[in-house]
Amino acid sequence: MRKLDSNLMHAALTALLEPKEQYQFPVYVGFSERYLSSLEQTYGFLAVTTHQRLLVSRFGLLTVPMKQQAFALQTLQKLSVRQIPLMKTRKITMQFQSTGKVESLRCFCSSKTFGMGLPNQEMQLQQLLETLNLWSTRSDLE
């Protein structure tokens, strides 16, 4: 069983890159869809790129790759970031619209990760959110 760590993050995000593209501000997140049990929760990574894209890499239980996606940042229609009370976790909801199709993404991101080799999670998260806010047509940051 592979561990979700900085090595897996780098490999997963690099696999989504276009030629001459680099990723920036990578963070570890938990993804949430409505009505899923805890066994169906997925985890993974988000990062923005030098080609103005959001990379999304999801892994299921036992680090099985689930879904790899990339969204053009100019298709970001809505961004909502909420601080969860009593926790250092943010709930991030994004909505992308491209060619008439709307896709929503909801994830949770903690400012600290332990045992994953991601010492700059808090700083990377702040920079990622600032970048997403620049591109969203409607944002609700808390």
State where each predicted segment sits.
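Anionic N-terminal interaction surfaces
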Residues: 1-51
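A short, structured loop/turn motif at beta-sheet edges
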Residues: 18-20, 73, 98-100
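Phosphoinositide-binding peripheral membrane targeting modules
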Residues: 35-45, 50-92
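Short, acidic/hydrophobic/Gly-rich beta-strand patch recurrent on exposed beta strands
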Residues: 92-98
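Canonical phosphoinositide-binding patch of PH/PH-like domains
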Residues: 99-123
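Short, charged interaction patches at domain edges and termini
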Residues: 122, 126-131
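Mixed-charge, glycine-accented linear interaction segment located at domain edges/termini
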Residues: 130-142
